[in-house]
């Protein structure tokens, strides 16, 4: 079974969201390097990243960038071919920076910062009064099945479940699932599994020509896939934050 797993450390980690907006989490505040990396992404996959909406996430930095540096980064990313549209929610300094830059602050990222905040330990809970009957456990939603082809420009989303496609996913089409994705035809478009962050989701495909595959936001484009895996039946999974692709025996 052949596989691919390329390990590298980039200044910015780009994750693909379920609504087509990418989240660029800044690891190293090196503006020229970040711009070069984005130019490389756009060059390798212009249909995917050209004029893509990007959210900037400074939460991984020890210090919020100053206004001049942030402006230089926004200008550089625009020149690289993408469109910075917002900052990810963070500290009060990031809130102020978003106002100075004149771009929105997206509160959908609030939880990842608030859970990391240091807070005093909670007081001990009061002794339980009496045992209450256990609440019924919700059953997972049944998987979604798509019998017809998913054509160019169409997007299919399976919320809180797996997605099974019995036909082809055409070039320019997008299939998304919070769980795993099973494609019994040809995959020429994009497949995004674990869209709500599930790292255990997988993608299974009978005929692999995907423009992009992603699991929990981590992605790989077709140009990064070895030729010997194209046109094969494959599985795609996430291991140590790296996409791995292997032929099915």
Swiss-Prot record:
Cited InterPro entries: CAP/MinC_C (IPR016098), MinC (IPR013033), MinC_C_sf (IPR036145), MinC_N (IPR007874), Septum_form_inhib_MinC_C (IPR005526)
A UniProt-annotated Pfam family: MinC_N
Low complexity bias (residue ranges): 131-142
Top-level lineage group: Bacteria
Region (Disordered): 116-149
Binding partners and assembly: Interacts with MinD and FtsZ.
UniProt similarity note: Belongs to the MinC family.
Role played: Cell division inhibitor that blocks the formation of polar Z ring septums. Rapidly oscillates between the poles of the cell to destabilize FtsZ filaments that have formed before they mature into polar Z rings. Prevents FtsZ polymerization.
NCBIfam families (UniProt xref): minC
Name of the molecule in the record: Probable septum site-determining protein MinC
